[in-house]
Amino acid sequence: MSNTMREASNVFEYQKEYISPLCDDMDVEYQIIDKDRYATYDICGPDPESPLPGYFTEYNGRDKNGLCAGKQPTFCSDKWKKEVVQRYLNGRCGEDELTKRGVEMWMGISVEETRRVRLTGGKWNRRYPLVDMMITKTMAIQFVEDYGLPTPPASLCWMCPNRDDDLWLYMKNNVPEDFKKACEHEKEIQMEWPWLWLTKYGVPLAEAPLTPSGGKHAQMDLVQFCDSGMCFV
């Protein structure tokens, strides 16, 4: 698992308490790879005017409802996850050896996220077991709970602009230290890019009119996630 250095703190707490011991019981090696050891970019990417995360932007104005009219393309999953995992494996196993035999990368993308599937061949071959088995996110969570484990938290960065209102509210109410970091992060990025925001509302996160969906977004608003297919490796 790639640690983007901004992963929601309750995710790693869950991984440490439940997933790591489970892997030990199954004799499966479990690794968390720090992004900063292998990534070539952090927030600022190759284009200094376009940071890697898909922040909302008012650069071209706002719509009739006063919301940000645009959203940045998302490259953070490629730079912080895909390339980090690949460089780690090349260094550990040998680039030539991996090129010769190929690597299967299992992606934790559920069947309702099929549009994010990217079929690949060659050295890095992506597999989508949940899609192949027609497993939805709700079903996957139920499997975990039926095994006797607590409901797993959503895995995404605390500053990820792809969070819907429900996820922002969950973090604000249940992981307030992460919400505070996200508010500070928004202020930091606006020192460099004052037209960017973490939410579509285009106001400081602490003041955003976040509204619960009442269960409407129980599957998360999958449409707004990036197309790279790399958020869940």
Question: What is each model feature region?
Answer:
Residues 1-233:
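Nucleotide-activated chemistry modules centered on ATP-dependent adenylation/adenylyltransferase
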